[in-house]
């Protein structure tokens, strides 16, 4: 089709949403998929493949990344795979098996073969706290939720444990019962705010980054910090050069310096550091307090290990250092640098930046300094913003200063979804862990059912890729800049390839994608095959080529395994629930069937052998191997667990070091290094990208869109922040609204006094509402959105009788809005409104009002008055089932007005659009480095640069400004006031009568 684009019209690749489906047998569909895999791999391999990809307009860097292998255009995603490790993560095993196909098509040896690209989950959802690897080197720190009860000071920031973690919220409530203090930081008066001792309201867009910097300043200035902890476990005593902004290296200071790390130390023996990695990170320098001399310090020199060496580093020092070559440089402790840096974040400036009262900021600083243990919990309310990296780093800073790390009830955590394949951790003594399942070598699979998982031969032929690049127009972040010309901001370890084949399971991928309508309109027409594997009819199914019906969890015919990020339980189940109601199969059986068909077509037994025990109906052999090879499950036997040897049948405790699970317990109590270059908790990053982008220090930045001020401005006068702006000046950014990618890379530094005088052109054009998109309690992402009672409960407009035929289903999606803001726009409670973001790129690029698809894609929904939200904030719950071409046609033509597609039965939750109508992909440069040193996800080893769900592009749907326009009245047939607002007048927001006001103020309570 690259050679003849007219075929995309002829066969409806450009209009999948108007095509229909045919039923096929499992054998037929397996054959179609297998033959398509072979054809796509062949089509995009070699020089002809490169030529075709070039004709399709892909960036040269992406084409080069294929390495001439068509298999690299094939993308696989196991959606939320921890919810079913064998079946759902099995999609990545399928991706690894593609090396067999590549070796055949390119006629290469196994060692030269390549597999597919593995798409992420955690980062693509925008759920990772992307700054955490910069601080401690781990993908993310999350505790068991029963540790919440041990906290004495609990701070929730952008987190809603009341509504969004209902099974575990009782642990949070126990804090109050046990005498702890609860604080909530959020723009709106949220459910957790109602449980709090005090609530700090802030301007959206992560203005509260400044709060944590101000708190840190107060703790330092007032000497409320834990000095031994700061010296022993943070990078604040290390010396930094003021010329290069790099940490001072021991080899540069001491003549004939011999590296100081012992091979018997934990860096090598426990954490898996290699010689090449050590050579890159080196040793560091402190100034000894007792002698006044400079001393080398290694990443193993933490905690008592440092003290036992007689080292007592200075915190407050600056001066000149003579280098080994005789030259001199100015250097300072990082502590001294932060004293300068934090001058921009006094109480007055911080209160102006975020809108919080100065007294409350000061109170929180005092509480964190004096109440122990203290914990800060962040969530998607933070991680869904562009500068979450900085905010995550900022929340750690006061905890680092006060020693609230590695102890029960203390820490900074970011629970946001059950994502952690790393629970099945690999170590040399245990075996390959998780990779023993997804990355077993397809050229040498173990066919002995009695073989230990430790002995499975592992080789990953795949490479990770962020679906965010697909969201981004199937493009890397490569920008034409005024001063540097065409510049690539996507590191080699992150570089995507063109997408020609998609296979995913357990995810409503298109519905949940940022810029979803842009994908449908502009990106997916170039994809040759989209395979959706799921348990319900979704919009993604409508826009796919093949939909494979998977069995639900209760219908599994074979054993499956799962674990959790928020509790310590391993769970195995299957084969004892309901028989499948329809012609569905377990996920692993679906994958195995296609593999078997590939082998039949290619006359190669290795494809079936790779799934041997699944095809034999014995996937528990793979589960046993997983248990054998993982540090957290080694020595467990499947049959023992199923027999109830460790408790309830099917359950056992994961073998963590502590109960509850306390991240970094070993670091603090056993003096092990953290998983960073310094071995310490890092308040500073000296990687080249961070220095270039102005983020070597933790700093407050405005977003590239969701701000009234200069897009992406760095609020700082620190002379040791020296960003490159690539010729994109403040004047240019304020004169007109520049392209989103240009705003993304604009790095301009100024004081708050200057920044608050600047303007965002989009704000000036009337896009003055921040759009928050939290999750609802009535769906999981988008799953179960079509359930009747979920629809009814999910909004104020639920009605099982659908008296108003405009309801798309038994309910209608709603937007929460401050009553005064709505009334100023002539909008009544219950009215329908259009919600629009920047029309230059949303709901999709090149949208015009006369395009029929624009009508489908423009967001239209109902307003719910909610005074809990400040004036310039609207809130729309995340991921309802979006409007599609078929659902729009249905509600416009059906007598009953339901938005249910005629041929598929797909039930939309909106008449028009989706909350994704107002989102786009923002490709954050700091998420795409090749130089960040951190721990690998699933093994005791280190790496530099990108890894999916670990250090990769985190999508940020909240980075948007919107305009709200009334569409039609909320009353019956679009006339007059919404019936409830009329009949319940006096009880609804903005219409409260005297009785209601008395009730709200507590005046109806009579004390005796």
What is the predicted function of each stretch?
Residues 427-439, 549-563, 865-867, 884-891, ...:
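Acidic, Ser/Thr-rich peripheral helices and adjacent loops at domain boundaries
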Residues 619-797:
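Long, low-complexity segments enriched in small/aliphatic residues
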Residues 191, 206-214, 533-543, 549-583, ...:
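Catalytic or ion-translocation cores adjacent to nucleophile or general acid/base/metal-coordination motifs
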Residues 209, 245, 379, 642, ...:
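Aromatic-residue-lined binding/catalytic grooves and analogous aromatic/hydrophobic interfacial grooves
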Residues 488-492, 496-512, 519-522, 532, ...:
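C-terminal substrate/ligand-recognition segments
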Residues 587-639, 726, 730, 734-735, ...:
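Long, contiguous, secondary-structure-rich segments that constitute the structural scaffold
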Residues 519, 528-529, 535, 574-595, ...:
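Phosphate/diphosphate-binding loops
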Residues 1-555, 671-673, 679, 702:
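Catalytic alpha/large subunits of respiratory electron-transfer oxidoreductases
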């Amino acid at each position: 089709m690259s050679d003849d684009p007219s075929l995309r019209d002829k066969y409806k690749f450009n209009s999948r949403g108007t095509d229909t489906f045919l039923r096929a047998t499992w054998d037929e569909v397996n054959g179609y998929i297998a033959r398509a895999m072979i054809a796509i791999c062949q089509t995009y391999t070699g020089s002809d493949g490169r030529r075709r990809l070039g004709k399709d307009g892909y960036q040269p860097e992406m084409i080069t990344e294929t390495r001439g292998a068509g298999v690299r255009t094939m993308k696989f995603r196991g959606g939320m795979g921890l919810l079913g490790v064998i079946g759902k993560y099995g999609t990545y095993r399928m991706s690894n098996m593609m090396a067999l196909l590549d070796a055949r098509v390119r006629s290469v040896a196994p060692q030269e073969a390549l597999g597919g690209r593995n798409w992420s989950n955690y980062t693509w959802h925008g759920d990772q706290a992307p700054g955490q690897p910069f601080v401690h080197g781990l993908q993310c720190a999350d505790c068991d939720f029963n540790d919440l009860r041990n906290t004495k000071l609990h701070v929730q920031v952008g987190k809603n444990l009341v509504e969004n973690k209902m099974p575990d919220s009782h642990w949070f409530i126990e804090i109050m019962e046990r005498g702890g203090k609860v604080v909530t930081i959020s723009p709106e008066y949220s459910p957790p705010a109602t449980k709090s001792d005090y609530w700090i309201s802030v301007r959206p867009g992560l203005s509260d980054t400044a709060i944590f910097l101000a708190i840190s300043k107060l703790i330092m200035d007032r000497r409320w910090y834990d000095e031994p902890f700061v010296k022993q476990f943070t990078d604040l005593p290390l010396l930094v050069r003021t010329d290069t902004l790099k940490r001072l290296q021991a080899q540069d200071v001491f003549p004939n310096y011999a590296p100081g790390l012992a091979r018997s130390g934990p860096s090598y023996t426990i954490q898996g550091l290699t010689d090449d990695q050590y050579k890159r990170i080196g040793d560091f320098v402190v100034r000894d307090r007792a002698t006044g001399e400079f001393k080398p310090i290694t990443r193993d020199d933490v905690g008592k290990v440092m003290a036992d060496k007689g080292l007592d580093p200075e915190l407050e020092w600056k001066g000149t250092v003579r280098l080994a070559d005789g030259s001199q440089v100015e250097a300072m402790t990082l502590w001294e640098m932060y004293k300068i840096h934090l001058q921009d974040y006094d109480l007055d400036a911080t209160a102006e930046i975020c809108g919080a009262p100065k007294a409350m900021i000061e109170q929180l600083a005092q509480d964190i300094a004096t109440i122990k243990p203290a914990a800060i919990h962040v969530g998607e309310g933070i991680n869904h913003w562009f500068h979450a990296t900085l905010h995550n780093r900022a929340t750690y800073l006061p905890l680092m200063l006060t020693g609230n790390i590695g102890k029960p009830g203390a820490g900074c955590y970011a629970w946001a979804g059950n994502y952690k394949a790393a629970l099945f951790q690999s170590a040399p003594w245990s075996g390959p862990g998780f990779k023993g399942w997804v990355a077993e070598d397809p050229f040498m699979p173990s066919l002995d059912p009695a073989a230990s998982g430790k002995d499975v031969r592992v080789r990953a032929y795949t490479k990770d890729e962020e679906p965010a690049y697909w969201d981004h127009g199937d493009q890397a972040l490569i920008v034409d800049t005024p001063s540097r010309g065409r510049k690539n901001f996507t590191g080699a370890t992150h570089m995507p390839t063109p997408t020609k084949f998609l296979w995913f399971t357990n995810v409503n991928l298109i519905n949940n994608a940022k810029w979803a309508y842009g994908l449908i309109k502009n990106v997916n027409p170039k994809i040759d095959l989209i395979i959706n594997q799921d348990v319900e009819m979704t919009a993604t199914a409508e826009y796919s080529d093949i939909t494979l019906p998977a069995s639900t969890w209760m219908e599994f015919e074979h054993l499956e395994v799962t674990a959790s990020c928020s509790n310590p339980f391993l769970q195995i189940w299957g084969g004892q629930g309901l028989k499948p109601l329809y012609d569905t199969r377990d996920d692993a059986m679906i994958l195995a069937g296609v593999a078997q068909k590939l082998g039949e077509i290619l006359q190669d037994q290795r494809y079936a052998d790779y799934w041997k025990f699944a095809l034999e109906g014995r996937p528990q052999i793979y589960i046993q191997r997983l248990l054998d090879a993982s540090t957290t499950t080694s020595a467990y036997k499947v049959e023992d667990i199923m027999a109830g040897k460790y408790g309830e049948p099917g359950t056992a405790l994961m073998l963590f070091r502590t109960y509850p699970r306390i991240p970094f317990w070993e670091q603090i109590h056993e003096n092990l290094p953290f998983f960073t270059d310094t071995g310490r908790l890092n308040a500073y990053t000296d990687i080249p990208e961070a220095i270039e982008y102005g983020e070597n220090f933790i700093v407050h930045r405005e977003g590239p869109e969701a701000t009234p001020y200069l897009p992406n401005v760095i609020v700082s006068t620190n002379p040791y922040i020296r960003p490159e702006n690539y010729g994109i000046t403040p004047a240019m950014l304020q004169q007109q609204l520049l392209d989103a990618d240009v705003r993304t890379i604009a790095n301009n530094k100024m004081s708050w006094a200057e920044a608050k005088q600047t303007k965002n052109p989009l704000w000036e054009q009337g896009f003055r509402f921040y759009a928050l998109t939290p999750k609802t309690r009535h769906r999981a992402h988008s799953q179960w959105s079509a359930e009747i009672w979920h629809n009814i409960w999910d909004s104020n407009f639920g009605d099982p009788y659908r008296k108003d035929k405009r309801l798309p289903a038994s309910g209608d999606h709603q937007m929460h809005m401050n009553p005064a803001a709505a009334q100023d726009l002539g909008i009544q409670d219950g009215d329908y409104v259009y919600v629009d973001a920047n029309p230059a790129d949303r709901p999709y690029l090149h949208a015009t009002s006369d395009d029929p698809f624009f009508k489908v894609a423009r967001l239209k929904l109902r307003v719910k008055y909610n005074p809990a939200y400040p004036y310039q904030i609207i809130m729309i719950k995340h991921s309802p089932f979006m409007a599609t071409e078929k659902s729009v046609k249905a509600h416009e033509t059906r007598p009953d007005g339901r938005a249910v597609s005629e041929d598929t039965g797909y039930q939309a939750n909106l008449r028009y659009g989706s909350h994704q109508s107002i989102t786009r992909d923002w490709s954050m440069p700091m998420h795409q480095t090749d130089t960040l040193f951190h721990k690998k996800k699933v093994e005791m080893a280190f790496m530099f640069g990108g890894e999916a769900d670990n250090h990769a592009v985190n999508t940020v749907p909240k980075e948007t400004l919107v305009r709200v326009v009334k569409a039609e009245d909320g009353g019956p047939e679009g006339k007059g006031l919404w019936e409830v607002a009329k009949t319940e007048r006096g009880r609804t927001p903005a219409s409260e009568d005297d009785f209601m006001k008395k009730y709200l103020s507590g005046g109806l309570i009579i004390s005796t």
